């Protein structure tokens, strides 16, 4: 079986649709990247990058600890995606052309993997994540074990029951901000910093907005299946407004951290990402259309989630580039 670097790149950029015949011809890494929805793992990797930059900014960067943090977080997220697909399949959620099976291959629904095969992927990936976590415990001390336990809790219980009882979106905010970035910073440096936790929220709000958008996109489907995501509980219209509010709050929190002196004034440059938010605002004024709009990118049925991802990518790139400049200025100034 030949290695397929072209598919590796594709699977890291989008969630590719593949037939059963195409799947059988793929190498094991390509299959793993598709099954774990590797294109979305970039959000987790960027959280690890931010934790590393904050550690470097504080003069406490440890490359090997950061590398294990990044690897462990990505593997944990991949494990969660696999368990998500398994849980939804055995609970009957993904049948009847459910949203998840429309935007990319669901390994069980599309017959790419057996239940045993998917659980094997999850077990191996989860074991690798656990091993990196245990290595960090040995390197950095027992307090890291608490962060490892918290991460394991969310990996195992996000899909059920948290997502079903309107706690999934809150879990995402906690995980991608305080836990991944704040906890990652602590694991790398050995010091807890509440300013770093606060500084993690602009990025975490973007990720949460993307998840919120996905849950609005499948509002009717989740409502029928009694999956009580926050949009189902709060209503579709209010949820659209909350997503926009979260995106605006990303900028306001960054400006606040500039005002109190945690950041240098260069971080106010995140306003350069605002045109991407302005561009998607019209989409959030009305409910999701029944059919794909003319000229809409080829990501349907992703609609609000696609808009959120577009803004989050723009904000994230600008935020990280400015944070690097901010870090250099901070270190030069002493």
Where are the regions that the model predicts?
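Topogenic membrane-insertion module of multi-pass membrane proteins
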Residues: 1-64, 68, 165-168
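Small-residue-rich segments of transmembrane alpha-helices in multi-pass membrane proteins
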Residues: 42, 46-50, 171-185, 203, ...
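Membrane-embedded alpha-helical segments that form the functional core of polytopic membrane enzymes
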Residues: 49-50, 58-86, 145-156, 193-213
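Acidic (Asp/Glu-rich) catalytic motifs at the cytosolic membrane interface
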Residues: 75-100, 208-231, 236-238
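Multi-pass membrane catalytic core of lipid/isoprenoid biosynthesis enzymes
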Residues: 97-138, 227-265, 306-318
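Intramembrane alpha-helical segments
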Residues: 104-192
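Functional transmembrane core segments of multi-pass inner-membrane proteins
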Residues: 172-225, 240
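Extended hydrophobic alpha-helices typical of membrane-associated regions
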Residues: 259-332
């Amino acid at each position: 079986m030949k290695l397929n670097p072209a598919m590796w790149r594709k699977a890291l950029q989008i969630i590719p649709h593949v037939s059963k015949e195409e799947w059988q011809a793929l190498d094991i890494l390509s299959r793993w990247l598709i099954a774990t929805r590797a294109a979305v793992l970039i959000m987790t990797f960027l959280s690890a990058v931010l934790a590393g930059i904050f550690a470097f900014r504080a003069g406490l960067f440890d490359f090997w600890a950061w590398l294990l943090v990044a690897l462990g977080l990505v593997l944990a997220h991949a494990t969660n995606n696999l368990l998500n697909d398994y849980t939804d399949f055995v609970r009957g959620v993904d049948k009847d052309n459910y949203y998840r099976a429309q935007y990319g291959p669901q390994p069980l629904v599309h017959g790419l993997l057996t239940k045993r095969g998917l659980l094997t992927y999850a077990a191996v990936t989860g074991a690798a994540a656990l091993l990196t976590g245990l290595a960090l415990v040995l390197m950095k001390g027992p307090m890291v074990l608490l962060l490892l336990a918290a991460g394991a809790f969310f990996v195992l219980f996000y899909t059920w029951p948290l997502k079903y009882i309107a706690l999934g979106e809150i879990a995402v905010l906690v995980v991608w901000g305080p836990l991944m970035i704040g906890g990652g910073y602590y694991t790398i440096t050995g010091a807890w910093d509440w300013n770093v936790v606060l500084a993690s929220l602009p990025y975490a709000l973007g990720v949460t907005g993307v998840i919120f958008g996905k849950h609005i996109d499948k509002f009717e489907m989740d409502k029928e299946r009694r999956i009580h995501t926050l949009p189902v509980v709060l209503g579709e219209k209010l949820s659209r407004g909350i997503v926009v509010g979260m995106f605006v709050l990303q900028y306001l929190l960054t400006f606040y951290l500039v005002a109190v002196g945690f950041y240098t004034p260069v971080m106010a440059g995140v306003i350069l990402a605002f045109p991407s938010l302005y561009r998607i605002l019209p989409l959030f004024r009305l409910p999701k259309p029944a059919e794909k709009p003319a000229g809409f990118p080829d990501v349907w049925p992703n609609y609000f989630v696609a808009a959120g991802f577009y803004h989050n990518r723009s904000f994230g790139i600008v935020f990280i580039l400015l944070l690097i400049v901010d870090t250099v200025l901070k270190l030069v100034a002493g």
